[in-house]
Amino acid sequence: MSHVITCPSGLAGRIRGMKVREERILADRKLAKSGGQVDELLGACWQETLDPGPYDFGDKLIDWGAVLQGDRFYALLQVRALTYGPEYAFALGCQNDGCRARFEWELNLGDLPVRPLSEESRAAFVNGNRFETTLPDAGVRVWFRLFTGTDERRLPQLRRSAGERILSAMLGWRVLEVEGVGDKDKRRFLEDLSMRDADFLVDEFDRVDCGVDTAIEVECPECFTAQEVELPFDRGFFLPGKGRMARRRDRSSSSPS
């Protein structure tokens, strides 16, 4: 069964759910280490492009490395929902130090808010993926870019190599140019930013970007503490829900030996 989707940037196409043969993609450790699983899954399940949105691939297949991170994640959510249904259950631990209970939370993936790419952001992306803002404390202009699939694949290595300087490393990766600052001095400038400017810059990244809001509020069933968590996105995301797995176990146990 196929389904037509429109991604946050306007990219539209026909997708299908995962097939058994896609299991090899999920099980490929080398592919997982290189960050290529998402590209492989999307390439396998994207059947037809109906509207290229802000991208220009011509008659070629979609280069998922050039697609915005928000579009990629949205498409993955739709593939997962088409494969197993929109319900997604996952385990959590209560953040209340006096509780720490483990519990399961379930949500409908279709209920996650989606932020479309604005016309202004689309124009900036098409014209070189270059966005401009002015830092409130430093008072200088900064130019930055939105993350694509190629960046997404490099993120694990960046996090490993950044160590305790993850914020400055992430800023340095996204910031293209700082007014009056040479390329050799850009890293030092970013490390000397006030936290107010750093927070402002991260907010600007989000403001002009598109995608799915994955911050969700859950409530511990034991102590009723409300807490905000990020939607878990790991290998379990592409596996059947616990209800489906339980039904499989029930069928197996009731089968004649």
Range-by-range predicted roles:
Residues M1-S257:
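Long C-terminal interaction/binding lobes of large macromolecular proteins
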